[in-house]
């Protein structure tokens, strides 16, 4: 018998029966025979045949394929050490950064990424001893470094709420605040605005979503907040016009694109 007993993004508690049959159990779950149960309080995340539960609280627990924002904390001979907010530091090897042949004896890797730089990568592999390997190949901006802006850190389980259904929430924030935003699935968000006031407004909206993620009518409240603040900025002469939204965003219930990536629209 093959059956899923819960909905994607459903809040579950430890011991909740999630699925039965040939599904793969991910983080936050355990298997007993053919049945998969939750081990934590969190949100169900279903990707293909894999079922995991994202804890409501606690550090980011990486999964292969996650797009993450990280900070370079050390530069080694042939790799970089990256903080992605997980219990363990991640590694970015030179071969996962570029296909170009690099003479490591003559090249200082700090010319590419230095300590303190912010990068955008994908979790490539996780070993049994929790070694986390990243790759920046094929990522927007070639993985970075991401210049300017600020890093906002939210609870990882609330990332889908920030993104919204089909990107509705984050695209609304980007459109109205005229900012560049990249959302990492580790809960780190890069925000780069045209000016300080717009950047702060985008951050205010994101943090409000983080605080109120499990409440109804959040999309309307975020829209109201943004329009109210923008009207104030217009009256002060900070901006000339308030951008118009092409479509009314719908209240988000799930994330269709699981990569957590957003770009300027």
Curated annotation (Swiss-Prot):
Q: Where is the KH domain?
A: 147-205
SMART domains for this protein: KH, S1
Q: Where is the S1 motif domain?
A: 65-137
Cytoplasm as a keyword? yes
Q: Which GO terms describe its molecular function?
A: poly(A) binding
Main role? Non-catalytic component of the exosome, which is a complex involved in RNA degradation. Increases the RNA binding and the efficiency of RNA degradation. Confers strong poly(A) specificity to the exosome.
Q: Could you describe the subunit structure of this protein?
A: Component of the archaeal exosome complex. Forms a trimer of Rrp4 and/or Csl4 subunits. The trimer associates with a hexameric ring-like arrangement composed of 3 Rrp41-Rrp42 heterodimers.
GO terms (BP aspect): CUT catabolic process; exonucleolytic trimming to generate mature 3'-end of 5.8S rRNA from tricistronic rRNA transcript (SSU-rRNA, 5.8S rRNA, LSU-rRNA); poly(A)-dependent snoRNA 3'-end processing; RNA catabolic process; U4 snRNA 3'-end processing
**Transcription regulation keyword on record:** no
Bias class Acidic residues marks the residues at 241-254
Identify the SUPFAM superfamilies for this entry.
Nucleic acid-binding proteins, Ribosomal L27 protein-like
The record's section on InterPro entries has: Exosome_RNA_bind1/RRP40/RRP4, KH_dom, KH_dom_type_1, KH_dom_type_1_sf, NA-bd_OB-fold, Rrp4, RRP4_N, RRP4_S1
What residues form the membrane-spanning segments?
none
Q: What is this protein called?
A: Exosome complex component Rrp4
What does the sequence similarity comment in the record state about its family?
Belongs to the RRP4 family.
Subcellular location as annotated: Cytoplasm
Disulphide bond pairs: none
Residue ranges of the region described as Disordered: 241-265
